[in-house]
């Protein structure tokens, strides 16, 4: 038996050796003298190297194939071969030609014989399209779609690797579009849509754990553009270009999107940090757009002699005043705290996009993002004319913005709207002064007299003396500097409450001896036998019934058009548990500013607080701020909170 088993194994080994010794050549690739390697692993459906050839001593007469190449048409013929389809549209022919200038209509051959494929390919001039589908439910594997409208003499796509190896490795992708290149051109002529040059150094992009990988996606859209070069050119500067993408669901970290409409010769966006560090930290974001920069302008560089639409100003200037700018945003569902939007349409004398790394390595590391658009740069311009739309300057100090646990965080949003403005906006700040508001924040009951209640820093309240508004103000805490003559000014009803305030420091030692009558009955009687007996019976009788109902008498009595605010509380209404938090937004309103003498703009910061010890009377037009209209609105648990919204409007 062992001899028979050994004999069978030797026979099988000899048979396998004969099969392996047979020469066979499965795949041959030639790429102008350079190697192109594509490695695709762990795909849901992997058909990258599928090659099927069946030939059993068949001889084919190719004389019948000559009719398919009788009209050569410079390599623009289309051949369609369809067999055994579930839905057969092989005889359907759709031809769409709009103002083609090549002088040759595209000819379509339907149901060409399959054995003519090699014969047709030898005459295709490099441009014929062959559609070959067999036994597919729906087969779009070789689909090539080209749409051109009014296009002339420009190659649609050219790829050249200038003598270097191009290696693309994609692993464990559900959908791999890392090398996807999409170009759409309408009326494009002789121009470079996109040029990429790494300055003689390596460009490395590492993106990991993405849902969808679009790291190499390049999308260019041009409408009515002139005098530009080839649509797409790729050159790696004489060095290797390596793109490694792993475990991405959607990776758009290197996505570059450029949209230009009638634009010429100019830089759209310049960014400079003033020689200091700019730090942006965003963590646990579902969508991170913290570095998104968008530019909007209308009618830019168009010279109009009408005195509307400002001229000769920068659209957007950002300077950190020589100090660090730190932005910390945590646990945001959507973080748009640093969003800058500028749109520009019909702009001239600008360059679309130039990327150069200054002779250094460019490294992009993005990890654990569901959708990573951190390097997305979108530039849109619409008819803009040299106006300062938005200027931000921190006055030489640190600017720190901390936003936590917001669904949508717009707490630091500042909105300025300029319509037909002739004069530049004045400084826009968040400081508040009591006399800068249309209706004073701190007001008495009578409309004839106003007084400001000042809280002094010294701990001796009896030094505050106010004689004029004594009949109106219940707030002044003291009239005389000494506690002894405090009982003298009894004719006015307002003087006893300050005496209560002066007696409060005396009452504080009083409750102490009462619970502790044993250790200190004598020392309290010795130093103050007389003054303790005189003020004690009156304040002892009064404050005992009054401390619970009378924290209110020292408060300021407010009018019908005013709202009482306690010390340390906000002057503008606060709202909590909001879906949208706009409580810290500033409002700036100016109408007909600069004309007919002008009108002062009001600046009220939403985080302004009352500093008076007796509280403040705030006008309802300020507390419930709604564009100058008095609206009483208290919002809690609201879906959208606009109570603290500060909106800047400037008309004429």
Curated annotation (Swiss-Prot):
GO terms for cellular component: extracellular region; hyphal cell wall. It comes from the Eukaryota. Its main location: secreted. Residues 501-544 have a biased composition (Basic and acidic residues). One of its GO terms (biological process) is hyphal growth. Disruption phenotype: Leads to completely wettable colonies and the reduction in aerial hyphae formation. Does not affect hyphae formation in an aqueous environment, nor pathogenicity and formation and viability of teliospores. Leads to the induction of genes encoding small secreted proteins such as UMAG_00792 that have similar characteristics of the rep1 repellent peptides. GO terms for molecular function: structural constituent of cell wall. Residues 478-499, 545-554 have a biased composition (Pro residues). Residues 1-21 form the signal peptide. Residues 22-23 form a propeptide. Residues 452-560 are annotated as: Disordered. InterPro entries: Hydrophobic_Surface_Structural. It is found in: Secreted; Secreted, Cell wall. Keywords: Cell wall, Cell wall biogenesis/degradation, Cleavage on pair of basic residues, Glycoprotein, Secreted, Signal. Glycans are attached at residue 584. Rep1 is processed by the subtilisin-like endoprotease kex2. Cleavage by kex2 generates 11 repellent peptides named rep1-1 to rep1-11. Water-repellent structural protein required for surface hydrophobicity and formation of aerial hyphae during filamentous growth. Involved in attachment of hyphae to hydrophobic surfaces. Lep1 and rep1 interact in aerial hyphae to form a strong hydrophobic layer. Regulated by the mating type loci. The rep1-1 peptide assembles to form functional amyloid fibrils resulting in amphipathic layers at the surface of the cells. Interacts at the cell wall with secreted protein lep1. PANTHER family: REPELLENT PROTEIN 1 (PTHR48128). This is Repellent protein 1. It comes from Mycosarcoma maydis (Corn smut fungus). The gene is rep1.
